[in-house]
Each structure stands twice: as C-alpha cells, then as structure tokens.
A protein has these predicted regions:
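A mature extracytoplasmic/lumenal domain signature
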Residues: 52-57, 65-67, 74, 80-84, ...
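Alpha-helical, heptad-rich or low-complexity scaffold/stalk segments
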Residues: 152-170
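Polybasic, proline/glycine-rich intrinsically disordered low-complexity segments
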Residues: 83-158
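Primarily extracytoplasmic ectodomains and periplasmic/lumenal surface modules that are beta-strand-rich
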Residues: 1-3, 76, 85
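N-terminal Sec/ER secretory leader and immediately downstream segment
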Residues: 1-45, 50, 159, 169-170
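Envelope-exposed proteins and targeting segments
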Residues: 47, 63-67, 72-76, 111-113, ...
C-alpha cells in the first residue's frame, strides 16, 4: 500500500496543473491493493501483473492509469503507459474492446508527452525511462504503517454533498 501511496508525477505541456500530483488516490489504492496482492500470489516470477484503474470524475469522464508491475531483485518495478488519462464513456468501451485484442507493454515506452514520474525516497527511475519506477521494498518508508492522507478535492466535494443532503433531511 505504501508503495502506491508514494508514486508522484509532474504534468507536461501548456495545460499542466501546478505542482507534483499523486498517481493513485486513496480510494483507488484501497480497491487495487487486494487485487494486486492476489495477482502476485498466483503469478510466476517470469510474469507481470497488469493494473488498470479508473477514477470517476464529473461530466461522464474517467481518468485512467495503466501500468505493469513485477518484482526483480527485491524491488518492485512499475512501468506506466497512462497516468490520469482522460477517458469518456465511449473511449472506455473502445478500450475494453482493444484490450481483448492486444496488450500494450509500458516497458517498451521510455517517456510520455504528458507526464513524468517523480521518484520519492527509496525509488529511482529505470535508466532511460521517465515512465518506469524501481521501488526498493527494503527501504524503511515501505515498512511503516500506512498514514491516512488528506482527501482529494473530489472526496471533499462528496463529503460536502453528503452533509448537505443530510441537513435537508433534518
């Protein structure tokens, strides 16, 4: 869980947001971690675990992350091909059809025009790759209990909407 919590990126381009952003939000991590653990428990050392996550956003769009993970020399390797890529409903449906035909391989990509991973403590980029993190799982930061983070803007908006709905009922 800590490994996913400490993955950050900077956006590139004219429409970039300010500052460094987290790749995975807390709600995504809570959903993904049990599935990733289960996948690694049945994978052979030569297999990779493919991870695709969607964070729901307003106006019928989702943000997609896609990466593959594998363990080599006590390090978790995570290679991304998509980070916070906006998807409409139609895009999502066509993606599902595409994945039944072909699988993309993020290790064959060296960078993205839209983002760059920013290594945290105990992490480094694979040489010549801006999209591939190597996480040293023996680093003490990944041995610590998970710290609850402040919610995302979307999570805060949802809490406010829930509170307003409760007050209307009273």
């Amino acid at each position: 869980t800590n490994a996913l919590s400490y993955i950050y990126f900077d956006e590139k381009g004219l429409l970039k947001k300010k500052g460094t952003l987290r790749v995975f939000q807390d709600d995504e991590i809570r959903k993904l971690v049990p599935l990733i653990i289960q996948a690694f428990s049945v994978a052979t050392p030569a297999q990779v675990v493919a991870v695709s996550s969607y964070s729901e956003r307003m106006l019928l769009t989702d943000q997609q992350n896609y990466c593959i993970m594998f363990i080599s020399d006590r390090s978790l390797n995570i290679a991304f091909s998509r980070i916070h890529m906006l998807q409409t409903y139609n895009d999502t449906m066509s993606e599902k059809k595409k994945y039944t035909k072909t699988k993309e391989n993020p290790t064959r990509i060296s960078h993205s025009r839209f983002w760059k991973l920013i290594p945290s403590a105990g992490q480094r980029l694979e040489p010549t790759h801006e999209n591939w993190l190597v996480v040293d799982l023996s680093n003490e930061i990944y041995q610590q209990p998970v710290v609850q983070r402040v919610g995302t803007i979307d999570e805060k908006i949802k809490v406010l909407q829930d509170l307003r709905a409760r007050f209307k009922l009273i």
